[in-house]
């Protein structure tokens, strides 16, 4: 997901019951996948395999769209992906994969062996978001659950994980059917809890790289809500940022709102801290070194005329290097405590949640160049953006680089060409982004792009010995 919500996502523990009924694909007109005007002939290797992939995919696409719609209608939150994981495990068994469930919680590992050769890991994420869907789609989610605080929330696949899962299953079907085109092992993983950046670590801690074939390469695809179907983008090197969660408990001395002089007001102190934190970015950081310090939540007080004893601040912090990360986290602690000292208040508690830290995502440059060249052959050079700017969103896919495994994540367009063109006009409304209640990717062409590119990338990395 490239953006997480600004506020810290709560760990949700209640169980969601999902209907097992299988919906038929809803008949929704889909625009044709755009074809570049000057698409050059791809090399013979690519042409032959792409034709075989497309032939297999043509016979699978209707069922993959139905799978997508089922998953979209029945989303499950982080750490609650029980039915989603079971459905994916069942789908992968049908392809002939050796499937293991409950790896690191709700994780699924499906191994497809096909003779000697390298090992390629292909990841999909499975969890949805606490968002009430407003797309108006006939297969829109109406799911609501209670979070751990007892608050009822809507649940929606608003980050494209449903597209990722359908493409993942489609890629497994294609590779299983075309074993004569490649040699080696593919490890498909269905990862839970990406939205709270916990699932990758859980699966690795559960022995993903010791109990199953260790990958020579790791691949992932992600939806892009701002570009048209049939296009994709990727970065060489830095792709996404470090992400840290910081909680600050601001302490004061409560009392009557009419007598502030006999209190130490933590609300005023918290407001000062919020403003002072912005100087970390504006006055302590090189303008060319990207840093984000966002206060996503502030809570304190119970009534108009009561000054509380404490205020809670919740921060998300984004950096791109280890040195900058360490410096920014120390600055947050220093600024919060200095503000309290100036207000004659008790020192605040500043806690960095290591459980919710995820390192920056760096695409292996050689792997990115290799896959990028292949994607240009598949889609045409003008449909591939190899200079996609890094974003300050975070992805725990970065953790699969453990043990120096080269990783590569790329982003496929998911909106119609018409919507994209309209959005380029002056004063046009912004397109619905990820983590919004209106994000509605086009299923069929998005899934096609995901399956075509991922299947060919796997084949490229798993060459058949002549």
Question: Model-found features: residue ranges?
Answer:
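Bacterial N-terminal signal peptides that target proteins for export
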Residues: 1-9
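Signal peptide processing junction and immediate N-terminal pro/mature segment
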Residues: 18-33
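Acidic/His- and Gly-rich active-site-bordering loop/insert found
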Residues: 28, 35-157, 163-183
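Metal-dependent amide/peptide-bond hydrolase catalytic core
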Residues: 41, 268-466
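Divalent metal-coordination and catalytic microenvironments
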Residues: 71, 110, 122, 161, ...
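Histidine/acidic-residue-rich, glycine-tolerant segments that coordinate divalent metal ions
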Residues: 144-156, 162-163, 175-297, 302-308
